[in-house]
């Protein structure tokens, strides 16, 4: 099956005349097993888990680009062999002529339909849909924000995850109503605060034509309140930031990531930091590699932590 948030669709070489879409898909083959320690591959047709023989599966991945009217406008087909435990990473490309570009005034949406089939039997094993939009953007020192080659003034607001008297539980129509009111007053940009937003909000921003700054943390290691996220930051920040980027990176509305809201570390002098060198290396090495980031006489722990989080984002999404 396609892994959770297992597709990553990017548009390259985009113009009004053509676009090249790159589709990265992560496939998984899940089996029930006691342990993952005794894995032995035999002759290329099966693997052995604790003496249990599990056959490998040859699959065909068909990725179809579907326009807003339901017409298939591009397709790519690839084959792979799936093995338990180890995901298969596939990369495909689709060339599209005369694409409809996503913009604030005309938020045109495509979707990628990923159809995974058993190569031998033709059985459909999974069908996965990824909404996507095709656009380019950049920042210019003189002109500001440029979307699809045109200057756009960002009229943005900070939108907290609540719905007034309705509370924080997600109500899609209530969110849509909020956005409709904001649209009427001339708003075209949303800053999520100060935590991963509801997917329903991002879907609506895609369809209604808002640009979004997607935000993760309200605090890092240093607490603002007694029971806030700082209690869990060291253990969970890598997983939580990774999940946010991988979950949300296909949304055309997102043009910027935020890795922290008014985090106390940005005002802390290096001498005032209480993290030991050993603790710093545990926190700062993404993936816990042997390479040491924090060293005596270099940047403060806070500067290194900022760099680490920014590097994580760029590694997971190089398009923003």
Regions found by a protein language model. Give the residues of each.
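Substrate-binding/catalytic cleft of secreted carbohydrate-active enzymes
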Residues: 179-180, 189-320
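Secreted/periplasmic carbohydrate-active enzymes, especially glycoside hydrolases
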Residues: 1-199, 204, 208-212, 240-243, ...
């Amino acid at each position: 099956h396609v892994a959770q948030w297992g597709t990553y669709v990017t548009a390259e070489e985009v113009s009004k005349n053509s676009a090249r879409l790159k589709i990265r898909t992560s496939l998984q083959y899940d089996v029930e097993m006691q342990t993952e320690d005794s894995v032995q591959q035999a002759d290329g047709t099966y693997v052995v888990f604790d003496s249990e023989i599990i056959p490998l599966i040859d699959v065909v991945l068909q990725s179809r680009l579907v326009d807003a009217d339901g017409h298939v406008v591009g397709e790519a087909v690839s084959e792979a062999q799936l093995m338990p435990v180890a995901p298969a990473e596939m990369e495909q490309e689709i060339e599209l002529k005369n694409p409809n570009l996503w913009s604030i005034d005309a938020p045109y949406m495509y979707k990628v339909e990923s159809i995974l089939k058993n190569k031998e039997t033709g059985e459909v094993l999974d069908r996965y849909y990824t909404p996507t939009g095709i656009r380019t953007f950049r920042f210019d020192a003189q002109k500001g924000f440029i979307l699809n080659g045109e200057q756009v003034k960002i009229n943005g607001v900070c939108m907290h995850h609540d719905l007034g008297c309705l509370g924080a539980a997600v109500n899609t129509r209530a969110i849509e109503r909020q956005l409709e009111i904001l649209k009427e007053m001339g708003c075209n940009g949303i800053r999520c605060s100060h935590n991963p937003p509801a997917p329903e909000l991002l879907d609506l921003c895609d369809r209604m034509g808002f640009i979004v700054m997607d935000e993760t943390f309200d605090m890092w290691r240093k607490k603002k309140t007694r029971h806030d996220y700082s209690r869990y930051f060291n253990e969970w920040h890598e997983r939580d930031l990774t999940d946010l980027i991988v979950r949300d990176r296909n949304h055309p509305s997102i043009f910027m990531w935020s890795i922290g809201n008014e985090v106390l570390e940005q005002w802390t002098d290096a001498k005032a930091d209480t993290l030991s060198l050993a603790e710093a290396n545990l926190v700062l090495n993404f993936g816990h590699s042997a390479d040491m980031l924090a060293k005596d006489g270099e940047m403060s722990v806070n500067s290194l932590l900022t760099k680490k989080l920014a590097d994580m984002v760029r590694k997971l999404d190089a398009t923003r």
